[in-house]
């Protein structure tokens, strides 16, 4: 009720609430109240694809069954677009935004004032992305009721906040121009190395600017969640692999019997080193028509460690996060079977089926890419063990996947997280970066919570 009332009082708000604190339910309660006050009002909800087709429909059926909705996704979205006038809620995945934008430009979608909800608003944190720029052009379509929702609003620091708040107030609080915002609050350098660091004392100015429309609810005050137990498993590279890893790091290349792998930049090198640690590296060749990517397999160290952890789990379901597709093939070879996997190329219907089976306890090992499962998916009833075969650079993806298990509805008394890391390598660097980013985001949470929001 606190979040619902905050929306009704302020109109445009940011629900900066921990995953599982009921953001979706609060928004639906607010929509029901506003529908009574403003008959005919419609709401557009933008969300990641899986929450669009699973979470929002389930939550509407549970908490607001009188609200009629449609989902503009899939092959029939053009037809359903013409039938939206009678719907209370129109749900659109971010992946369909370009299509929706073109429909609006062509006036094939009714142009009027809609309440708008940005679910997982950190997906519009980049001020220069095509997604954000399209939203900026569509802002005149949206009423004064605008809601941003995120449990991970600033995964890369406070600089991530500008475009999310711009969608709410057209630049009133954090300036109407990103360059002005960056110059006012941050030190910015580049090229060749681009760095953005907060100016001394600027954090408090940002916190004060956004405080009045931000609702921050700390999980400790509202939820009795199981603790997260973290175990880091450090692997030492054997001498030959250590020699090859160091050579790749120093020389930006690595030789194989049939090819030579090159890293053209520091960023490319970082990616090649991370591939190496996961068991293989990609090389690219041009066959005259297109670029072909070839996988060169190196080792199975992490897959073998996962096998050991599965034995320790003693039959309890395990959720395992990977970063590269070749990891799945290595895992299948080591485990001697093909566990279900959800990543970019997995059809949504298959992914939904796997998640349902997981929640019923029918899948002993589910392999996922955090970008495919992390946002707004309910899989907490299926298990309490998470293994990171590879950590992502993104704090958002990292925390979102963790919060799929550490949330309301988790049946176990604790969630166990294993991180498989290779010592004295990029793995350790990534873990340190995630820790620093988390500290910055936690400072934001603490400041807003202490302010009473």
Mark where each language-model region is.
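Conserved helix-turn-beta segment of the N-terminal RecA-like "Helicase ATP-binding" lobe
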Residues: 51-75, 171
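Walker B catalytic acidic pair
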Residues: 119-120
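Conserved Helicase C-terminal RecA-like lobe
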Residues: 8-12, 19-22, 26-48, 224-249, ...
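Inter-lobe coupling linker of SF2 helicases/translocases
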Residues: 91-97, 104-105, 109-110, 129-144, ...
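SF2 helicase motor core recognition
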Residues: 98-101, 156-158, 326-332, 351-355, ...
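Conserved helicase motor
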Residues: 50, 71-79, 93-99, 125-130, ...
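Conserved helicase ATPase motor motifs in RecA-like P-loop NTPase domains
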Residues: 19-20, 142-158, 166
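A conserved SF2-helicase RecA2
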Residues: 393-453
